[in-house]
Amino acid sequence: MVHPQLKRSIESLSFSGYKLTRRNLYNAPALKVMGRSVNNSSSNNNDQQQYNLESAKQNTQIVVIGAGLAGLSAAQHLLRHGFRSTIVLEATDRYGGRVNSKRFGDTYCELGAKWVNMNIDGAHNTIYELLRNAEGLRKQLKQRECANYVHTQGREVPPNMVELIDMQFRQLCRGFKVSEKVKSGGDLHVLDNVMAYFKTESEKLVGHSYPDPEKRALAREIFQSLFKEFSSILGCCLEYVNIEHITSCPVQQELRPLYVPTGLDNVLDTLTQHISKEQLQTGKPVGSIQWQTLSDFGAPTSPLPQERKCVACLDGTLYSADHIICTLPLGVLKNFSAILFKPALPLEKLQAIRNLGYGNPVKIYLAYKRPISRWLKSNLRPLGAQLGKDEPAITVNGRQERLWTQQVVEISQLPSSQHVLEIRVGGGYYDEIEKLPDVTLLEQITALLRQCLRNRLVPYPQALLRSNWSTSACYLGGRPYFSTTSSARDVQRLAEPLGDIAPTLLFAGDATALKGFGTIDGARTSGIREAQRIIDYYYLKQYM
């Protein structure tokens, strides 16, 4: 066995012009020559290696596409490690991605991510750590609030029934029954999707706990409300969600997550404080990503811009790149990956993009002129909302389906406000609800409030604020999920970098992180992961 120090010396010499073979390694004269050369060249090699690393840090051109949490975290990490030629291109006129706080009424509202869990899969949440270390920023823990279930048909909803069903549902969300099926060798294929799982298991619980037909019907309605709550987080019908999402990526938020009364976008200040305006450019939608050229296969490097690795924006500007970190939302990749990348992405990666689901959580806020507490004493969860004969329904493919207010999960007063209500919707029809005219939406939610509160004097809102993730060309949706055609393997395939020797095209974003999949923590850690991949490449390269 060759001594490690001698082995390193041999490797250094082989790159200095010496060609050692197994035969002359054990030749005494050769070893004497080698020994003298090592002493003279080791310090020179160290200096040369250090110079090469510093040169790489100064000259390596890195383009980050997208200034959401993944892109900003990647850029921050690269700049901290000295890679000064890093630039971030953002298509919209703002940075932050799904972190989007708006001043509305007397408070700040979140059109994207809202709550920050302290832990993700048992580990500290990196966004929580950022907020915790932000000096002078007011943070609060969400207080546990018991929503008041109100049946629009006047039926009484017993609190003890709500408490029991809520506890049972939390167990289902943690995959409690799925785990039992796996341990017992049960057939998971009969469940097929999350809704099938929820319905199958909840029916067993309802049948066992409530023999009375009326109570059984009410219990089903409460369960249905909780199903819609789960659906509202992902922004899709649960029939589309793979059962693996329950077992691999817990969706339910903690009982007391953290929130920022002055807007979660304060976290962006920490990420951008050392990124200059030249390095963070907004209003730069990307039209083409040339991630591989003929020179990668041994051909001479071409002076023509279109034959170099580069990112081309729709305004005509070109950015040369040694490495490209793509943090485009999954919705954009689904619609444009076939035309964005040159050459085309490998079939395996395109298949992963197609397989993964992308939901559209809808956020709706209403502002009132006078304090809400005059007529709303607690958060409301409506049950049994019916379609009135004079009220328009949601139209899907030319058919009238149902009133959108039947999708309302909860109506709640924002904890930092006296004048703003949040309307939480779930179950489906997210894209259709997002496109409803303002007047229709305001009239129907006011009618629902008056019905639930038995109060025809509930005022009309003064203003409306809502999200538009599915109709924004730069997002085309809001959150990834495991569809029934996808699995954790698709997340791994999407995250794999491309490039024969160097990692040329890298992928980050909440859809590329198994740990924290679909969360802002997953977005941040994925950006750091890909930045570190580039850093590691150059640190290792200096010894090659």
From Swiss-Prot:
Q: Which domain of life is it from?
A: Eukaryota
GO cellular component terms, semicolon-separated: cytoplasm
Q: Where in the cell is it found?
A: Cytoplasm
Keyword annotations of the record = Cytoplasm
Keyword Cytoplasm found: yes
Major place of residence: cytoplasm
MF terms (GO), sorted A to Z: polyamine oxidase activity
| Function, in words | Has a non-vital function.
UniProt protein name: Protein anon-37Cs
Gene responsible for this protein? anon-37Cs
